[in-house]
């Protein structure tokens, strides 16, 4: 599986179709459809700054919370607009977990294959972002919440193009969540844990170095409790920061403000 993630089919222009475009809120927006190598499509929205650049780039990958209205690529739209207005090319993307029923439809037999496909799709989104005119490859941030953060770590350990990371309310091991449903016991459970250990974020987060990392966690998060957060953070190499907020799994407005400020400071040229 790791070889499939490494030797992926790179994105070509023919894989992307423009659905709609317009200018508002001080930036240009483009709604796009991406054809994947796996026979299905993914939506994304591109936010382009005004001016000549060069521009930093940010890939935003949302969380999974089926009871929340922003458990999809809409989660980071407002943030992407703000960052684009201040000089960053931003892309918000559809994922496997954009489907509210994704978790109950899958089984552990699907998780490794789904993970491989998700990493390939993320790498192809990176291809697209860095192919934008005036994109600065030396200022490329990956921002991921929940599964978005976990798969970002895995993708980034293979694809070293992102130069900065914000990892939000992520857990260090996929079985922490993928064993919620369906229930596994005994040898099948242990076999699954062993299988997924090859791609667990905690096994790969050190490979993001020397990219600066910002970890954001809530102090009342049942899915990424403080103990797991500290283990995950401890496995990462410097430079790194971890912030704990008075929040649950969805984090807080305070964390949003801190994240935007961190990105602006790290990527430079964003006022």
Predicted regions and their residues:
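Cap/lid segment of the alpha/beta-hydrolase catalytic domain
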Residues: 64-120, 177-180
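Conserved alpha/beta-hydrolase "acid-adjacent" motif
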Residues: 222-228
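C-terminal catalytic histidine-bearing segment of alpha/beta-hydrolase fold enzymes
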Residues: 234-271
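Short beta-strand element of the alpha/beta-hydrolase
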Residues: 44, 54-65
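N-terminal cap/lid segment of alpha/beta-hydrolase-fold proteins
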Residues: 9-52
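Active-site nucleophile elbow and catalytic-triad environment of alpha/beta-hydrolase enzymes
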Residues: 190-205
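Short beta-strand/loop motif that positions the catalytic acidic residue
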Residues: 208-209, 214-217
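Primarily recognizes the serine-hydrolase "nucleophile elbow" in alpha/beta-hydrolase
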Residues: 123-183, 187
């Amino acid at each position: 599986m790791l070889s499939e993630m490494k030797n992926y089919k790179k994105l070509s222009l023919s894989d992307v179709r423009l659905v709609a475009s317009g200018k508002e809120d001080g930036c240009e927006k483009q709604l796009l459809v991406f054809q994947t190598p796996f026979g299905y499509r993914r939506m994304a929205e591109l936010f382009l700054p005004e001016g000549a650049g060069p521009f930093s780039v940010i890939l935003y990958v949302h969380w999974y919370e089926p009871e929340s209205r922003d458990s999809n690529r809409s989660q980071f739209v407002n943030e992407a607009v703000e960052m684009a207005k201040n000089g960053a090319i931003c892309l918000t993307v559809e994922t496997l977990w954009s489907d509210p029923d994704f978790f109950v439809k899958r089984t552990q037999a699907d998780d490794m294959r789904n993970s491989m496909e998700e990493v390939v799709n993320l790498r192809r989104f990176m291809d697209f972002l860095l192919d934008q005119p005036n994109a600065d490859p030396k200022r490329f941030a990956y921002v991921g919440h929940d599964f978005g953060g976990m798969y970002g770590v895995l993708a980034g350990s293979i694809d070293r193009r992102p130069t900065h990371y914000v990892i939000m309310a992520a857990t260090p091991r996929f079985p922490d969540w993928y064993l919620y449903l369906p229930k596994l016991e005994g040898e099948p459970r242990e076999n699954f844990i062993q299988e997924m250990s090859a791609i667990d974020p905690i096994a790969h987060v050190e490979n993001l170095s020397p990219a600066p990392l910002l970890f954001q966690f809530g102090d009342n998060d049942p899915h990424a409790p403080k103990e797991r957060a500290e283990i995950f953070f401890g496995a990462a190499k410097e430079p790194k920061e971890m912030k704990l907020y008075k929040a649950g799994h969805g984090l807080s407005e305070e964390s949003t403000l801190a994240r935007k400020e961190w990105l602006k400071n790290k990527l430079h040229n964003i006022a």
